[in-house]
Amino acid sequence: MSNHAWILLGIFLVVLLLTVKPLGTYIANVMEGRFRLAGKIESPIYRLCGIRPDEEMGWLKYACAILLFNVLGVLAVYALQRLQAELPLNPQVFPAVSPDSAFNTAISFATNTNWQGYVGEATMSYLTQMLALAVQNFFSAATGIVVVIALIRGFARHTAKTFGNAWVDLTRITLHVLLPISIIYAVFLTGQGVIQNFNAYKDVTTLEVTSFDNPKLDDAGQPLKDDKGAVVTEPAQTQTQTLAMGPVASQEAIKMLGTNGGGFMNANSAHPYENPTPLSNFIQMLSIFLIPAALCFTFGRIVGDTRQGWAVLAAMTLMFVALAYTAMHFEQQANPLLTQLGVDPASGNMEGKETRFGIGDSGLFATITTLASCGAVNAMHDSFTPLGGLVPLIDMQLGEVVFGGVGTGLYGMLVFAIMAVFIAGLMIGRTPEYLGKKIEAFEMKMVSIAILVTPLLVLVGTAIAVMLADGKAGIANPGAHGFSEILYAFTSAANNNGSAFAGLSANTPFYNVMLGIAMWFGRFGVIVPVLAIAGSLAAKKRIAVGAGTLPTHGPLFVTLLIGTVLLVGLLNYVPALALGPVIEHLVLWAAH
């Protein structure tokens, strides 16, 4: 790993950790109703919507409210896509989005996945981008945060039947946290060169003729392949280029802050209109981890022991550093097949990367975005080396708990913390407890569901795709890498990440439906058990710390938590990883 990469990683961690306490304290004050201006701002909204802020909910009612909120979001996004040809702010006169793609996109943005099988600047009108996709970026982020706040209250309260009001929590986190930070962030991005306008697209003449290979398409619009499975292409030339316009900065801000990741442009944060400078790139990386890291302090603040939050944050940080080092290390190594063709190995694996970012910024961005269930990219993960590309896969397959998405990462890590203290209790023959609450059969059943639902969706979905002709038809690269593309797609969808090995042609009815199902159950198949755990914990009595109680704020617990995440979270995927990136790595270096 280069000196630049080490310095970049060090500066990133220092700046991130400096923000944890102030932002975490602010979020705790907002969500616990201690923000002074909240009442004046919120009261008109509550009256307009008929919400009684003093009426709290049990876990089942809270879960139903969250599900209803998100179902309505799916329906709204689907309708806007299907009607966009008849709606204003469509200067390119884009037609309605196809039913299967609209279904996939609606679920994708409602679940904070932001998987995009379509080309954003060639599919979505400005109204759809703003009113459907950007709005859901706020709402899906708010959903994740309020769920983890509910779980934290479950630990903090005792002998209680309720832990908050879902509508109040959603309002507070959106109005007082997500919205103000996004406004400031969008202004900063505009200053860096991110575009923000409603102009029609611009056709310009390039300085020289551009030659490229254009894939031949069949009657269904899918690439034709030869008998070896390779895409058939034909040479083409052009001297014109269409420059996409649009309100990018306002969407870019919440896309990163809310760990959403869906780009206005198809190239996402590799596009200069979304991420033009190294400074904007650094701030985008920082903003992805900003709220997930701060929520760890919020957790400690609300339960009354900030050491608990720092312990969870320490476990996350240690795993993050190891994974970031691995990604940057393997991307710094040149592809041996390209080296044989005369490419200078000193530059590392620059395929699919922007020269303004290079190896360090691209490798670190890839690690951050896949750990945090963001999915935004500033480089093409499909072009990473086999082991460099293995890191984003592992990041997601850990369950998106190393920082993770806003809210989702922390509640996922707390689920693993419950599992860790349960394992420790079994080893010493004592009833496990965490933060003064006994961990009993009901909690462990819900923990098991929350941990196992995602691997089930990933592995079953991948198996179905490689067995059926419709699934194999989307593979652009046969062999181990083609399998990795499918595995990555279902891993990304079920873990609500949204990034992709872009070689897979996923905008087909088969993948739109299959990935849509994986996204929905990968999100709410975890949220409902987590809320059930919160309700059960809130109803329990708090027990005093005894001589046999495992301290959950020291190095021993941090080590146990990391081990639990690695063993329980990752082992499910080892056979699948062996069939994909591991085989590809061995084949690549065997050829060398």
From Swiss-Prot:
For this chain, the annotated S-S bridges are none
Location, primary (coarse class): membrane
What is its membrane topology? Answer: Multi-pass membrane protein
Residues that span the membrane, as ranges: 7-27, 60-80, 132-152, 175-195, 279-299, 310-330, 409-429, 449-469, 513-533, 556-576
Keywords of the record = Cell inner membrane, Cell membrane, Ion transport, Membrane, Potassium, Potassium transport, Transmembrane, Transmembrane helix, Transport
Q: Which domain of life does the UniProt lineage start with? A: Bacteria
Q: Which InterPro entries match?
A: KdpA
| A GO molecular-function annotation | potassium ion binding
Q: Where in the cell is it found?
A: Cell inner membrane
Choose one Gene Ontology CC annotation of this protein and give it. Answer: plasma membrane
Briefly state the protein's biological role.
Part of the high-affinity ATP-driven potassium transport (or Kdp) system, which catalyzes the hydrolysis of ATP coupled with the electrogenic transport of potassium into the cytoplasm. This subunit binds the periplasmic potassium ions and delivers the ions to the membrane domain of KdpB through an intramembrane tunnel.
Similarity remark: Belongs to the KdpA family.
The record describes its quaternary structure and partners as: The system is composed of three essential subunits: KdpA, KdpB and KdpC.
Output this protein's name: Potassium-transporting ATPase potassium-binding subunit
Say which species the protein is native to.
Answer: Dechloromonas aromatica (strain RCB)
